[in-house]
């Protein structure tokens, strides 16, 4: 199957949602799903589904629907969800602590293996209820050495975000999910995905205000 390497970012962001939908269909013993069924489950239109799928070659035949098991496995392969992906979390403040207790592995095969914070943080040396250890950031290099960990969740204050990012890149981190509302400078080959909660809320309020004007 030929996959277009240059898929739009909007399409890429929907990949995990498609995977979730096909897992749900599979659990409900649905064998075939039309683009309309997929679109309705996603809250988008059928044309968007067909356009997204066109980037991945021949996923189904027009008029026959999409094979649910085949597509579930396809997206599992695409998202590397056949094996467990371990990640680290850096910054054990309010957001960080909440994420440490979030059970990622209940839905997908990924889990937080370790948490890190400043060496003087009271949580350092303890474990969460799910047995996730929290270490001092000065030990991050030795802690992830000889592991397959290449991904980090960053929940540190904005003023420290770039410094910590540089430190993580030095120890081999290739992907960062950042909750810091600042632009991070990273070298080629390192991917940063930003989550700006304030921006998302402001966008929501904008659309709500526009809705009131209609």
Swiss-Prot record:
Keywords from the UniProt entry: Cytoplasm, DNA-binding, NAD, Repressor, Transcription, Transcription regulation
The UniProt record lists the keyword Methyltransferase: no
Alphabetical list of SUPFAM superfamilies matching this protein: NAD(P)-binding Rossmann-fold domains, Winged helix' DNA-binding domain
One GO process term, biological-process aspect: response to redox state
Its biological purpose: Modulates transcription in response to changes in cellular NADH/NAD(+) redox state.
HAMAP family: Rex
Protein's recorded name: Redox-sensing transcriptional repressor Rex
Organism: Streptococcus pyogenes serotype M12 (strain MGAS2096)
Gene: rex
């Amino acid at each position: 199957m030929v996959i277009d390497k240059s898929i739009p970012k909007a399409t890429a962001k929907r990949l995990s949602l498609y995977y979730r939908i096909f897992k749900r269909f599979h659990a409900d013993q649905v064998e075939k799903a039309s683009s309309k069924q997929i679109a309705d489950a996603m809250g988008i239109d059928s044309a968007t589904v067909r356009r997204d799928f066109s980037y991945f070659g021949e996923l189904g035949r027009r008029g026959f629907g999409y094979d649910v098991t085949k597509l579930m496995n396809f997206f599992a392969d695409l998202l590397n969800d056949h094996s467990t992906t371990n990640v680290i979390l850096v910054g054990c403040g309010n957001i960080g602590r909440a994420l440490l207790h979030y059970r990622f592995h209940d839905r997908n095969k990924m889990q937080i293996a370790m948490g890190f914070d400043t060496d003087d943080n009271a949580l350092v040396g303890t474990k969460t209820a799910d047995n996730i250890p929290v270490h001092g950031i000065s030990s991050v290099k030795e802690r992830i050495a000889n592991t397959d960990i290449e991904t980090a969740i960053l929940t540190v204050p904005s003023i420290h975000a770039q410094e910590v990012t540089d430190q993580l890149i030095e120890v081999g981190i290739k992907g960062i999910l950042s909750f810091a509302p600042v632009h991070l400078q990273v070298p080629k080959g390192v991917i940063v995905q930003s989550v700006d909660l304030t921006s998302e809320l402001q966008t929501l309020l904008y659309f709500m205000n526009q809705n009131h004007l209609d």
